């Protein structure tokens, strides 16, 4: 009895161990099931519970899922410890541990995948503004000037964030170049082919960043307009009256109005004004000559005091001298041979100088003729009358002829007819000019009393004929 019971228990354990290994002999079990169906069972078989009996495999997806779920439920039931507290068989335990370890490994793999996905996106935007990026690009170039495409190329090569998002920020770089005064556009040279202008930094924007750090900008740079230096001194000089100083052509007054520009102060920052030899090389400020000092003073005085009288103009000689010295003018060697202006005394006296000037073919009156107006015509007529009076002519006051010799007197007067006609025409022209123009406009050379007396004498002589 005991031997049979022990053998039965051993056979039961063997059955359990064979059943616990699921999926190990699926092909063998399928073949056994087919043999059972065909032959109706040949030899003795181990008793298998009804729940463990495998059904014919169907090729539908739902049937396969149901079979797998039933097998997993059966495995859980077999692996569960009995109610009496007997220890579980040692076989399935390693499989369960391996499954748990595999699950842990899968979790670790999942965690590693999440960490890898987090480290896969390191694109962080740099903490620099577009102005700082452009400044970096320009400063690293050898000539301290770059085009828009070269600036974008530098930024893309230096920062991966902008390399990945390249087309989006190119317009921002363009707008910052155009709208900020710290960047100056330089056109291309005629012999330098290419597209786009160059951009450089304004020399006065060196202190734009704090201590050379591009993380923070100290202030917004604004380009100052070109104003005359020392404006306060110029205004005070204008208020005191700069007309006399400008009229005298004093170089000291001109230097006070327009002093030379002072040299730039030494830079106190450590990184220097962006290095040396970059940007626009502006020419030094040159003060204007003293010739323009009076004009500038008059314009500024009129702007400050619109109701005040203008300052007196500079003398003719001083202005001419200033013009010659300011513009490097030197008199031509033939200039001494040209006739100079007629002195006022000679014009009033009506001497030979005036007549020679009137008869000169190079004078303005001889070239233009009578188009200078009535004053010039009156002056020319007066000069001609003075020349006629200086020449020998019969006395205007003649003794009255005897009654018996009236015919002889008329014949004598008829002999001098052409000369008298010329004199009468000249005197008539002088009288007409004197009636239309005042004696001051005729330069004081024509006296109305003399003209009237001459007309009366000629009228009396004509009536005697």
UniProtKB/Swiss-Prot annotation:
Any single Gene Ontology cellular-component annotation: nucleus
UniProt cross-references to SUPFAM superfamilies, sorted A to Z: Winged helix' DNA-binding domain (SSF46785)
Region (Disordered): 1-117, 391-410
Keywords, sorted A to Z: DNA-binding, Nucleus, Transcription, Transcription regulation
Bias kind Gly residues: ranges: 98-116
CDD domains associated with the record: FH_FOXD1_D2-like
Keyword Cell cycle: no
Organism superkingdom: Eukaryota
Matching InterPro entries: Fork_head_dom, FOX_domain-containing, TF_fork_head_CS_1, TF_fork_head_CS_2, WH-like_DNA-bd_sf, WH_DNA-bd_sf
Entry's localization field: Nucleus
Result, substituting residue 356 to G: Decreased activation of transcription from PGF and C3 promoters
Main location as per UniProt: nucleus
GO molecular function, one term: DNA binding, bending
Pfam families, alphabetized: Forkhead
Ranges of biased composition (kind: Acidic residues): 15-39, 61-77
DNA-binding positions: 124-215
GO BP: anatomical structure morphogenesis; axon guidance; canonical Wnt signaling pathway; cell differentiation; dichotomous subdivision of terminal units involved in ureteric bud branching; luteinizing hormone secretion; metanephric capsule development; metanephric capsule specification
UniProt feature, compositional bias: Pro residues: 393-403
Task performed by this protein: Transcription factor involved in regulation of gene expression in a variety of processes, including formation of positional identity in the developing retina, regionalization of the optic chiasm, morphogenesis of the kidney, and neuralization of ectodermal cells. Involved in transcriptional activation of PGF and C3 genes.
Record-given protein name: Forkhead box protein D1
Source lineage: Eukaryota, Metazoa, Chordata, Craniata, Vertebrata
């Amino acid at each position: 009895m005991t031997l049979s019971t022990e053998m039965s228990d051993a056979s039961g354990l063997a059955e359990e161990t064979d059943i616990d290994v699921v999926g190990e002999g699926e092909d063998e079990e399928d073949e056994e099931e087919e043999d059972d169906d065909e032959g109706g069972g040949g030899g003795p078989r181990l008793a298998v519970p009804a729940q463990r009996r495998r059904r014919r495999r169907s090729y539908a997806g739902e049937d396969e899922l149901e079979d797998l779920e039933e097998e997993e439920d059966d495995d859980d039931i077999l692996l569960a410890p009995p109610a009496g507290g007997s220890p579980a068989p040692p076989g399935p335990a390693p499989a369960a541990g391996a499954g748990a370890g595999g699950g842990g490994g899968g979790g670790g793999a999942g965690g590693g995948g999440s960490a890898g996905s987090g480290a896969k996106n390191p694109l962080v935007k740099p903490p620099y503004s577009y102005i700082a990026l452009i400044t970096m690009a320009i400063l690293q170039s050898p000539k301290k000037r770059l085009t828009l495409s070269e600036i974008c190329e530098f930024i893309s090569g230096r920062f991966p964030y902008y390399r990945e998002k390249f087309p989006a920020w190119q317009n921002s770089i363009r707008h910052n170049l155009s709208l900020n005064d710290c960047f100056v556009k330089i056109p291309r040279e005629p012999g330098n082919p290419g597209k786009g202008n160059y951009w450089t930094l304004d020399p006065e924007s060196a202190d734009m960043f704090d201590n050379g750090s591009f993380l923070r900008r100290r202030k917004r740079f604004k380009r100052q307009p070109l104003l005359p230096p020392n404006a306060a001194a110029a205004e005070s000089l204008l208020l005191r009256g700069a007309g006399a100083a400008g009229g005298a052509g004093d170089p000291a007054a001109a230097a006070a109005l327009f002093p030379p520009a002072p040299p730039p102060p030494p830079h106190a920052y450590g990184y220097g004004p962006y290095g040396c030899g970059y940007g626009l090389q502006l020419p030094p400020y040159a003060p204007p000559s003293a010739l323009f000092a009076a004009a500038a003073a008059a314009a500024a005085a009129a702007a400050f005091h619109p109701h005040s009288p203008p300052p007196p103009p500079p003398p003719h000689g001083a202005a001419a001298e200033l013009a010659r010295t300011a513009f490097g003018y030197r008199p031509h060697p033939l200039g001494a041979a040209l006739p100079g202006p007629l002195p006022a005394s000679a014009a009033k006296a009506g001497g030979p100088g005036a007549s020679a000037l009137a008869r000169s073919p190079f004078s303005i009156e001889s070239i233009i003729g009578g188009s200078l107006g009535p004053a010039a015509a009156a002056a020319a007529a007066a000069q001609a009358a003075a020349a006629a009076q200086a020449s020998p002519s019969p006395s205007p006051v003649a003794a009255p002829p005897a009654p018996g010799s009236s015919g002889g007197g008329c014949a004598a007067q008829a002999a001098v007819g052409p000369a008298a006609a010329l004199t009468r025409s000249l005197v008539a022209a002088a009288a007409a000019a004197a009636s239309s123009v005042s004696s001051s406009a005729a330069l004081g050379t024509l006296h109305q009393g003399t003209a009237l007396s001459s007309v009366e004498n000629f009228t009396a002589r004509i009536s005697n004929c």
